[in-house]
Amino acid sequence: MAMKRAMNLFPRYSVIAIAFVSALIFSSAPARGAAWNGIEPLKTRRDEVVKLLGAPIGESPDGVMRFKVMGGSVQVSFVNDRFVTAKKLRTELAGTVLEIVLQHEHSSDTPESLKLLNNHAFARDETKTSTIFRNMKEGLIYTFVEGMLRTTRYTFADDQLAKARRY
């Protein structure tokens, strides 16, 4: 009888143990912004971006680099000293990627094809001609113009910025 009772409790305790271990693993994962092609906000430096994407086709006076990629172009902006001061970040973050903006020339992606319409992780904003889906927890923003994907922004996650602050 005691053996039968122990065997009945085993599945219950194993489910609880698995849930506990899973929660522990997922809660200890580091905060990360949305990465693209190995480039990650607040981690990747300018020289690493050039190594990954090649020579830029242009660079603005404030340091935003433009690259031609398959399917469009990409702009990579970097953390500068003003941003570090304004957001009270650690000084070593100056020179890391702030944001990656991928401009799609002929994308056929729609909110439906990316399964964004019922995804509650994304906040939705609409204007007459555009729809924007934002997931700031992951640092990902999609902009659709007349229903077609035009830009994808990869930036830092909310809690990644909080962890980057100096205290």
Labelled PLM ranges:
Residues 12-17, 43-44:
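Short N-terminal leader segment in a subset of presequences, especially plant chloroplast
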Residues 29-33:
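Sec/Tat signal peptide C-region and signal peptidase I cleavage site
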Residues 34-39:
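Short, recurring structural edge motifs at helix starts
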Residues 15-25:
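Bacterial N-terminal signal peptides
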Residues 44-167:
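A cross-family detector of function-defining hotspots
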Residues 1-11:
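N-terminal secretory signal peptides that target proteins for export/translocation
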Residues 7, 24, 84-86:
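Short, contiguous, well-ordered secondary-structure segments
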